[in-house]
A protein has these predicted regions:
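Conserved short alpha-helical segments that host acidic/polar catalytic motifs at enzyme active sites
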Residues: 1-250, 256-319, 323-324
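PRPP-dependent phosphoribosyltransferase catalytic core
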Residues: 187, 202-204, 209, 221, ...
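Terminal amphipathic helices with adjacent charged low-complexity linkers/tails
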Residues: 261-277, 322-359
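A short acidic (Asp/Glu
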Residues: 24-29, 119, 207-210, 217-218, ...
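Phosphate/ATP-binding catalytic cores across multiple sugar-kinase/actin-like superfamilies
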Residues: 189-192, 295-316, 329, 334-337, ...
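Amphipathic alpha-helical
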Residues: 157-177, 338-357, 361-375, 381-382
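Conserved hydrophobic/aromatic pocket- or pore-lining residues that grip, position, or stack substrates
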Residues: 255, 303, 320, 334, ...
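Extended, hydrophobic alpha-helical segments in both membrane/secreted and soluble proteins
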Residues: 320, 327-334, 338, 372, ...
Length: 593
């Protein structure tokens, strides 16, 4: 869990299951906490149960099995990375559904956003249930719990048919539960990106990946352990493994372990169009993964020529740096690209000196090199990418500080590479303001990702399109050029899409708002929107191209953030519906004012 801290600092939880507890004793344990120190807190709380026990007791396996809380055979841990900006312990995984029958207890956690919650809510209420909470996690828990109840009841009837009674029925149920039945009858109804893990009170454990492979999952198993994690290097470090030892869970596949410890891979849902998320590779995932490191490096290197154009090929007076730390590997790629270009120019200059160059001339040429500095520092550990909206701007103004005199004022260009630019909050409220204090000749902000034009409904829930600086800039261009009829046309087209019957192919009608404008036009408008008041330094934006994205990350084609090509019907429905909401509430309100 410590090695996956990059996947969430808002909370953490763990659960454990004992396989051989007697009635009257707890067999399913859970601990949760909020805050960036949550991992430390939950383990400290677990260890409190062991105070006062002798080393002999702690080393006694039989004593541990019968008497020690959290000493079990099944474990599950989760780090919270908000997908909605909501906070509170009730949102921290794992979630637990209790029952007096061991086999009906279900503990669940996961990385997911479901895009058809209305449909699921309707299915549950049609069954006669009355859900207390309207959220994808809670509804998934209840839906899966209902199917688990049905699987237990199926085995109960079978046991009675075999003439079994009382405890023999319970043993039969626990020995014959088919978690694959539960997963098949549950997950066929859900639309979205997910990796869901669960454990039952009777000792079954599972992990399932969505059929589009949107969210990542890796596993390792041998004769002693079965382990699943969101990232490969976490397993490598924790269990001292090579890349080749670890497998990736396939689309729609589940890794299931029964109470006897027998692990099997089962195809629960037929694979759909392969759409593994590219933004996982750019931002979310740990950069120490072998392949992710190479991909991020290439993303940066591919931007070399466009950055050189932005600084008029003046490498002598250009300083390279990066913000935030997740952009560091892309920064290395950019510096490698600069080095290759400078080295090539050195060769050309030396050849041009002729057959008898002077030592001084050669020395001057060889002095040319990359100028890279640590210009910005993250002053405190604050994340503004996903924060409750009313506090985001205030946080952003305090996130970064600068290294003073790291560039030559009014002479040096300053190039800052970021992994991606989403809202532009930190740029506007902090970064551009503090970089301007260095008085560079020009600031070039480089994004290793393409322009983010559409929300992600599969992992990071940013439901309002007006949150994106690219969208806001495009709307401003539309208004400036008196093209607001285009917005109305898109609005009407979106309404037609969401009115289509379920199962009919949907299109993303919102794409049309971007078509009249070039990337450069949108970039210039973004600069106008994000430029702090009083800033005088010229600013230019450079984004990765879609082609560059796929060239650097060829095995993860999911690019809906940038293209609007959502792989699931639920994603398509939401992008159209959210534009309808924007048009009816924000755009019309703007016109009235």
């Amino acid at each position: 869990m410590e090695k996956q801290h990059n996947r969430g600092q808002e909370g953490a939880g763990l659960s454990a299951v004992k396989l051989s507890s007697e009635p009257g004793n707890e067999y399913m344990f859970r601990e949760r906490a909020e805050g960036k120190n949550a991992v430390t807190e939950i383990f400290a709380d677990v260890h409190k149960h062991y105070k006062g026990l002798s080393q002999e007791q702690l080393s006694d396996v039989s004593f541990a099995k019968t008497s020690l809380p959290f000493a079990g055979e099944l474990y599950m841990g989760h780090l919270r990375y908000s997908t909605t900006g909501k906070s509170g312990l009730s949102y921290v995984h794992p979630f637990l559904r209790r029952n007096n029958w061991k086999a009906k207890n279900l503990c669940m956690c996961g990385n997911f956003n479901m895009t058809n919650i209305e449909d699921i809510f309707e299915k549950l209420t049609d069954q006669g249930q009355c859900p207390r909470i309207y959220s994808d996690t809670y509804l998934l828990l209840e839906f899966m719990g209902h199917r688990l109840d049905r699987e237990v009841e199926r085995n109960f009837v079978k046991a009675q048919e075999l003439g079994l009674t009382k405890r023999d029925i319970t043993e039969y149920i626990e020995d014959n539960i088919q978690i694959s039945n539960v997963l098949k009858t549950t997950m066929e109804h859900f639309d979205g990106g997910y990796v869901i893990c669960g454990q039952t009170g009777s000792g079954e454990m599972f992990s399932i990946r969505d059929p589009w492979a949107i969210r990542p999952a890796f596993y390792y198993k041998n004769d002693e352990i079965v382990v699943v994690a969101s990232e490969r290097p976490v397993l490598q470090t924790t269990f001292d493994l090579e890349c080749e030892d670890i497998q990736e869970l396939k689309p729609g596949q589940a890794l299931i372990v029964n109470k006897r410890g027998e692990a099997s891979l089962q195809q629960i849902i037929e694979p759909k169009t392969y759409s593994a998320c590219s933004f996982e590779r750019i931002y979310f995932s740990r950069g120490s993964d072998r392949d992710i490191y190479k991909e991020r490096e290439k993303l940066g290197q591919q931007l070399t020529e466009r950055v050189l154009e932005a600084v008029n090929y003046d490498t002598t007076h250009t300083v390279l740096s990066f913000i935030p730390n997740t952009a560091e590997v892309a920064f290395y790629g950019l510096t490698h690209g600069f080095k290759e270009w400078i080295d090539k120019r050195k060769v050309e200059q030396i050849v041009a000196l002729g057959s008898n160059p002077s030592e001084e001339d050669i020395h001057q040429i060889l002095k040319q090199g990359i100028r890279a500095e640590k210009v910005a520092w993250k002053d405190i550990k604050l994340r503004t990418f996903i924060t409750e909206g009313n506090s985001r701007n205030d946080l952003a103004s305090h996130v970064y500080d600068i290294t003073y005199e790291s560039i030559e004022p009014y002479k040096d260009n300053l190039v800052i590479i970021d992994d991606s630019i989403v809202r532009g909050t930190t740029l506007k409220e902090s970064i551009l303001h503090i970089l301007d204090r260095l008085h560079p000749k020009k600031i070039v902000i480089v994004s290793s990702a393409p322009q983010i034009r559409f929300p992600d409904y599969y992992g990071i829930d940013m439901p309002r399109p007006e949150e994106f600086c690219v969208f806001r800039a495009t709307i401003e261009l539309i208004r400036e050029r008196n093209m607001e009829n285009l917005l109305h046309e898109v609005y009407e087209a979106c309404k037609k899409e969401v009115a289509k019957p379920k199962g009919e192919h949907l299109n993303n009608s919102v794409k049309a708002i971007y078509k009249p404008f070039t990337i450069e036009e949108i970039n210039q408008k973004i600069v106008e929107i994000l430029r702090p008041q009083g800033m005088t330094t010229p600013v230019e934006l450079v984004f990765q191209s879609i082609e560059g994205l796929h060239n650097a990350i060829p095995n993860h084609p999911g690019d809906w953030y940038f293209t609007g090509d959502y792989p699931t019907p639920g994603g398509m429905r939401l992008v159209n519906q959210n534009f309808i909401n924007y048009y009816e509430h924000e755009h019309l309100k703007h016109n009235m004012s």
